[in-house]
Amino acid sequence: MKIIYKDGHVDECPQDQELHVIRHTAAHVMAQAIKRLYPEADFAFGPATENGFYYDVDLGDTKLTDEDLASIEKEMHKITKENLAIKPFILPRAEAVKLMEERHENYKVEHMADLADETEFSFFQQGEYVDMCIGPHLTYTKALKAFKITQQSGAYWKNDKENRMLTRINGVAFHNQEELDAWEKEQQEARERDHRKIGKEMGLFMTDDLVGRGLPMFLPAGYTVWQELENYIKEKERARGYLHVMTPCIGTVNLYKTSGHWDHYRENMFPAMEMEGESYVLRPMNCPHHMMIYANRPHSYRDLPMRIGEIAHDFRYESSGTLKGIERGRHFCQNDAHLFCTPEQIKSEVADVCNLIFETYKDFNITDYRCVLSLRDPADKKKYHDDDAMWNHAENALREVLTELGIHFTEEIGEAAFYGPKLDVNVKPAVGAEYTLSTCQLDFCLPAKFHLTYVDKDGTEKTPVVLHRAILGSLDRFMAYLIEETKGKFPTWLAPVQVKVLPVSEKTLEYSEAITEKLVEAGIRVALDDDNQKIGYKIRAAQQVDRVPYMLVLGAKEAEAGNVSVRDRKGETTTMEVDEFIAKVTSEIKNRTYNN
């Protein structure tokens, strides 16, 4: 694939850069199409991205419809058929600014002013369209073979909410139509698995703008799943000596100044509330509260390790564009814990946390994940606590422990928490990009800030080390992950309704009610569908909408024999004695069998 660089030379494109160049060129072709249809359009930035491209554009008061996006895409195809040559040129600063001013490219002019040290600027031209760009690009527009405009959204100029809101138009581009078709198939699968779609169908959770964006509410069915997850992880933690606590959802601003959140994390926090001369804030994390619980009484080395756990309500200000159902909201419940230990106990505590993570993943059949050692960016003094010695010690300690434990990991700069390095376990969901579920963070910073101590064997006071860890991450995100992995077909122990009783007709309603009562007595979550509908409709509703693990189809034959006809989600049926069926289901519940 031939590409042209800003100095005008043409060469073969390195294979690992092909998609980037294709997508960057697609952004220019889209901008040209927009300019033809909307001559007053004023363009900001239009880069290639990991999965496609976008362009931010100021369209004045014009609001684009889906039909408008289709027209832009149609014009893009016209431009590719014109097979316009893509040619670079370079201008000195004064001429470059004049060119952009003449073309009414106000955002480009402002951007050039920001690049005060640049003496010249490069441009690429195709037909009548000119864009300031460093390239490289395809040599002709006809080389752009497969693309699609996907959506529009809002974006602030320079990502600053004080600036004008622009229209961001997104698209995708690939080498050929086959790759685009494969992407569209993947997108269809993503839509079918989307936890927001399934959550609505199953009545798991809801959102309402009157309540607030990013503030989902769990309905009875969804809260049942949520409670089962809570019970599961608390049992695991209790078996490992965790002590569970409950702390307030707010704290004073001074609390977060002490912890450092106010200096390093304030942009992710909600504004402070003033009450009786004191400032309070919704908590984004639970660390400060747990530090105060440890500080509540004196400690000896004999008390350590001390493991404090909580299913805690947290609140973070997320921009509206990043919100996604229960996967990412402004309120969530974190499976949080803080482990206070001596330096000598770091290895064993990290090992126990890792074992708990991997044991949990095995229970939920999670196999596609990778471990990342997230480190600070030493150049970013604003984001991270400024103590080089502490950071070097903490990063080396966690790196050594993970290496000794034989855990394969990669390292990523700039992804640490502000107070210390961490192990992130990133999962690859059924569709979409990977994200972090579990974390284990090593912290020498907060214990010192809160003046935490313990009396060591030699009688001297020392500062404990703290491990911050979350196994399920937030229960909300973990539930979203499970919904998309299973398409809502939860294993029996997690399912909101574990058995649905379906009487064939009114004649077997009394028998169905008796069976329902017996299942309830056995501790099974059961629902009786006594609607006056045909049995085929009832089966489809239970199987395809409610995704119930088991359906009992009860007709005259079953009522007479005193047994049940069992139908599972796969459509397989068998006849069983009532007690036999109850034993099967209760065993799956007790053992938390992962069958879906």
Regions found by a protein language model. Name each.
Residues F45:
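Conserved P-loop NTP-binding catalytic core
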Residues M1-D42, E50, D56-N596:
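NTP/phosphate- and nucleic-acid-binding module
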